[in-house]
Amino acid sequence: MAFGSMNSSDDSPMSDINVTPLVDVMLVLLIVFMITMPVLTHSIPLELPTASEQANKQDKQPKDPLRLTIDANGGYYVGGDSASKVEIGEVESRLKAAKEQNENVIVAIAADKAVEYDYVNKALEAARQAGITKIGFVTETKAQ
């Protein structure tokens, strides 16, 4: 055996080094570096522009974008008709009709901040299926 006993007559020091803990630590470090390196190499440093309220007022807003409202419960409302709730299939057909009337139609999605992302994703998919490429999101500006 590699381990000596107290009663052994062999007084020479044990020359075998146990490398198992060293290998374990090295493998853990290797795994940590393998996980963190893609995160470090794929980040792109950006300095995003900031917009003031004055700059927002100066932007030319398109005339009457088609408003698609999504309430907190996931209900869809197309246009200014807040009384009639429609299903996602009806949303797509109304967006197609708007695209046929105006080739450059712009959709403004106004989603409640409590709505799940899945409902917004379905609205975006309906707009894509209708062939609409100009889509914006309605937000509130922070009061300073």
UniProtKB/Swiss-Prot annotation:
Pfam families: ExbD (PF02472). Residues 40-144 are periplasmic. Keywords: Cell inner membrane, Cell membrane, Membrane, Protein transport, Transmembrane, Transmembrane helix, Transport. The keyword Chaperone does not apply. One of its GO terms (biological process) is protein transport. The keyword Membrane applies. It comes from the Bacteria. Residues 1-18 are cytoplasmic. One of its GO terms (molecular function) is transmembrane transporter activity. It is a single-pass type II membrane protein. Belongs to the ExbD/TolR family. Involved in the TonB-dependent energy-dependent transport of various receptor-bound substrates. PANTHER family: BIOPOLYMER TRANSPORT PROTEIN EXBD, EXBD MEMBRANE COMPONENT OF PMF-DRIVEN MACROMOLECULE IMPORT SYSTEM. The accessory proteins ExbB and ExbD seem to form a complex with TonB. This is Biopolymer transport protein ExbD. The lineage of its organism: Bacteria, Pseudomonadati, Pseudomonadota, Betaproteobacteria, Neisseriales.
